[in-house]
Structure formats: C-alpha cells, structure tokens
Amino acid sequence: MATTRFPSLLFYSYIFLLCNGSMAQLFGQSFTPWQSSRQGGLRGCRFDRLQAFEPLRQVRSQAGIIEYFDEQNEQFRCAGVSVIRRVIEPQGLLLPQYHNAPGLVYILQGRGFTGLTFPGCPATFQQQFQPFDQAQFAEGQSQSQNLKDEHQRVHHIKQGDVVALPAGIVHWCYNDGDAPIVAVYVFDVNNNANQLEPRQKEFLLAGNNKREQQFGQNIFSGFSVQLLSEALGISQQVAQKIQSQNDQRGEIIRVSQGLQFLKPFVSQQGPVEHQAYQPIQSQEEQSTQYQVGQSPQYQEGQSTQYQPGQSWDQSFNGLEENFCSLEARQNIENPKRADTYNPRAGRITHLNSKNFPTLNLVQMSATRVNLYQNAILSPYWNINAHSVMHMIQGRARVQVVNNHGQTVFNDILRRGQLLIIPQHYVVLKKAEREGCQYISFKTNPNSMVSQIAGKTSILRALPVDVLANAYRISRQEAQNLKNNRGEEFDAFTPKFTQTGSQSYQDEGESSSTEKASE
C-alpha cells in the first residue's frame, strides 16, 4: 500500500513545485532588487548631454488628444522607454487596445473608469437585465429573452492614481466627469516582455489612429470579411463594421448618451448593491451611485466580485486568486501614504512591488515627490533603474552629473516637462520659490537609490577618518560633513532661507519630521 502511495506523492509534489515556480516567475519573485528583467539599452549610449523634453506632436481624435514624445531621440532609445500623454474629454472613451510593452499610467487630473482584461480570468461582473426602452416582461415569460452581459472588473480612477498596464493586456478608459482626464503613459520597451523591436506599439481592437506616417487601423481590418465573420459568428455586414474602415473618430471617441456597464455603487445604508446597467450621467447623479472612499468593499487592495443569481460551487485555483484579483491601481498622491515627511521640506511616496504587487507584472515602480518652497532633495543616484521624471506642478533646479564628474544637465525643469535620468548618474534637485511636485517612473519594480547626505546616507555610513583623508579636511570638518543634516533624510529644509519665509505644511500632517506609517 505504501509502495503505491509513494509515487503518487512524488508526482503531486512535483506538480506543486512546478506550479509554484511558474507563479513565482509570473509575479517576478525570481528577481532580487539587484537584478533586472530588462534587455538593457543600446550599446554605445553615452548620455553626454541630457535635455528636458516636451511632446513632439499631437494627434487629435473625436473626444481627445494624444501627445507623443520623441521616442526616436537617443535618450529615449538608450533608456528603453517610450512616453505618451493622453487627454480624454468628458464622455470620451479610449477604445480597447493593448501594447507590446508593459507600462505605468499616472492620472494627472480628472476621474473616470478603466478596465483591464486578463485572459483566462472569470467575468466577475454579471447581470441579467431588461432593456430600458421595453416594458416589464409578463409573468412567466422566458428569461432567455432578457439581455445578459458580463465583464471583468471595472476600476474607478481619479487624480493621483497609478495604473499598471502589463504587456498584451487589453485596457480601456472612460471619462465620466466634467473635466478632461489627463494621463501620462510610460512604457518600458526594453522589458523582456517585449520581444518585438524596442519601440512602443499600439494594437487597437476598435477605431484607428494616425500615429504612423500612414493611417493605422485596428487589428480586425487586416482579415478578410468572410473569414472574420465565420470566426466570430457574425454577419459579413457586422464584420465590415468592426473593421472600422471608414471610421474617422480616432482612438478616443465620444459617447454622447453616457456609457453603460456594471459597476458598484453605494446606497444610503452602506452595503454595495448592484442593479441593471445604468448610464453614467452627470456628476451629481453619479455621486449618489458611487462615492470614492465610502465603499467598504471597494478599496485599494481588495477585489469586488459578485454575480447575482449564481453561486460558485467550484473552487478558485491559484491563478484566479493571485492573478485575477490583483488591484490594478493605487493612489500615490494621498498624503497619508507618504513614506517620508518633513513639515518644512516636503513628502515622498514610493510605489513598489511590496505595497503594489501588480508592479511585479510590469517590472516598474514609481515615486512621487512634493517639495516645498526652496526645499532641496538629498543628492542621490539610482542603483538599479533608469528614471523618467515628469514635472506635475511648479519648478525645480535640477543638476545631473556623470561618471566623469561632468555636468550633463543643469536647468530649470518646468510643469509638463520630462527628464530622463540614467542609472548611476548623480542628481541634485531644489524646488523654486513656488515649490514643485513631480513623479518619477523607474525601470525596476523595487528601485533603490543611494543618498549622499542625510541620516541614511553614504556620508553618514563612512568613518570620519576616511572622509578627512579623502577630502583633505580636518576631523571636525569631516564630522560636520557627516552630521550637519541631523536626523533629516530625503527632503531637506533650506538652510539659508530669508527671514519671514513661508512655511508650507499640509493640513492634517504632523509638525515634526517623521516616518509616515501606512
């Protein structure tokens, strides 16, 4: 009997280890912070002279604008990144599409909904409903005459959200607010997930675009009408329509009557309810259906799965539990999420694979910095990633130095501008009088920096005699060099401020330097 069970035990142990290894690879656990899943930049890249970038050109759609940065520039190609900025007008729908490279999206302003469609995951939003323009069905009428729809999870997005976009995953976005959604997209085209050429490619499921020299169409337009209709089980007339041959609206279209899909909303009693599809209408009407931060079942890190009229008798497998229920977005702007905070200098918030596990799928991370008037950031270098810095608000003096001690960038970075900071290059940033806010996209899910000054810095870690002999200074001067910043780290208070200078402090934040708790 034992002889019979032993081979079976070995077999199941092997299967468990195989599946566990596959999941670890899927979520990036096989990489340490010192490793990278990237292919590396172009050989011969020197980054001798950096520059601030603004969008090179715009492409207009029916309900929005797409701004493209110059991905052919050597700095973009050497860093292996591609950047675009989208403006989606109210009632604008970004049509379903996917990309050949993983990326991160930061919502600069606006609010709306987005959906990410993962293959093999269940459609957890399901509802049978009756068309709005028909009377109630008579009692006993067949339920099969009711319309039925089901789709995967829909995410509410707002200003300050970071959305993770894995390569090859279909996504869409709808603006249900009364102000445009402005979003910046950063793609890591050198990631191993991209096995095409190292440039960002959009694959449209609907609509068309004008990015290339020739008019780009959606993926269905390349198939013959007959084969397409047979494969999808539709008429040839419908097949011609989904090819969008004569559709001039672009990839952002206007939905005049509001978009209809199943979404959670909050009743006055508190629990999440779900009804037939309801069109997204005005902001006042929407606020009675769904209010951010008031739903106990629709918050960051949780998944909302409900299927009216159906019970799940099968158990979820590991893929569904760990992959399909991942949170697609996290808000990086909330002061309560700050990792470090100095009431006289500013705050810094990090998103990495530890507090945002979905970043393991895109192998990227993000850092948002809010510097107050004349505050300065500790000089540092990125240990394991390139950095794409996008100025959100205000201005900052930025200086970057290469391995030869040469200044490769020394200028004021302004709102809307972008700067690529290469790995290991040393950077120093100081806010102007109005302060500054920026976000940095890193090409590693657990990006690390080495600070030069402050409590956790390299200088603090070196012996006094090493500093004194290295710089030919006295021991007292070396001691001052180590400790002049006291207990400060990351964001520093300006040392030589004018009398009466304004003290910036966010409402609800502490009055002393502290390490913010999650």
Curated annotation (Swiss-Prot):
GO terms for biological process: seed development. Residues 1-24 form the signal peptide. Disulfide bonds join 45-78, 121-324. One of its GO terms (molecular function) is nutrient reservoir activity. The keyword Acetylation does not apply. Residues 50-240, 330-479 form the Cupin type-1 domain. InterPro entries: 11S_seedstore_CS, 11S_seedstore_pln, Cupin_1, RmlC-like_jellyroll, RmlC_Cupin_sf, Seed_Storage-Functional. Keywords: Disulfide bond, Seed storage protein, Signal, Storage protein. Residues 495-518 have a biased composition (Polar residues). SMART domains: Cupin_1. Hexamer; each subunit is composed of an acidic and a basic chain derived from a single precursor and linked by a disulfide bond. This is a seed storage protein. Belongs to the 11S seed storage protein (globulins) family. This is 12S seed storage globulin 2.
